[in-house]
Curated annotation (Swiss-Prot):
Belongs to the PHF5 family. One of its GO terms (biological process) is mRNA splicing, via spliceosome. One of its GO terms (molecular function) is RNA binding. It holds the Pfam family PHF5. It comes from the Eukaryota. Signal peptide: none annotated. GO terms for cellular component: catalytic step 2 spliceosome; precatalytic spliceosome; U2 snRNP. The lineage of its organism: Eukaryota, Metazoa, Ecdysozoa, Arthropoda, Hexapoda. This is PHD finger-like domain-containing protein 5A. It comes from Drosophila melanogaster (Fruit fly). InterPro entries: PHF5.
Length: 111
């Protein structure tokens, strides 16, 4: 996700003992490079990103987490798993634009 959207910002604080989770939509993806091949290292996130209502949420989109997140083998070899907490902090311009477009035209989500 972050590889294809350069405006997304990672948390990058010191990771704690909390394990990152992924939702059904992102299940099996590498958190850094979005590949589905060779999951290797378990994702650790900082305590701030796992506090309160954020506990058990998806690292990429913030949805309810269903499985553990992993870094792929190539990201582990390049030591991208040591860069800090990989949780995405901001929404990004594409999601905010979608929100305001829906609001402008009056579309509502029916649950």
């Amino acid at each position: 996700m972050a590889k294809h959207h350069p405006d997304l910002i990672f948390c990058r604080k010191q990771p704690g003992v909390a394990i990152g989770r992924l939702c059904e939509k992102d299940d099996g993806k590498c958190v850094i490079c979005d590949s589905y091949v060779r999951p290797c290292t378990l994702v650790r996130i900082c305590d701030e990103c796992n506090y309160g209502s954020y506990q058990g949420r998806c690292v990429i989109c913030g949805g309810p987490g269903v499985s553990d997140a992993y870094y792929c083998k190539s990201c582990t070899i390049q030591e991208k798993d040591r860069d800090g907490c990989p949780k995405i902090v901001n929404l990004g311009s594409s999601k905010t634009d979608l929100f305001y477009e829906r609001k402008k035209y009056g579309f509502k989500q029916n649950y």
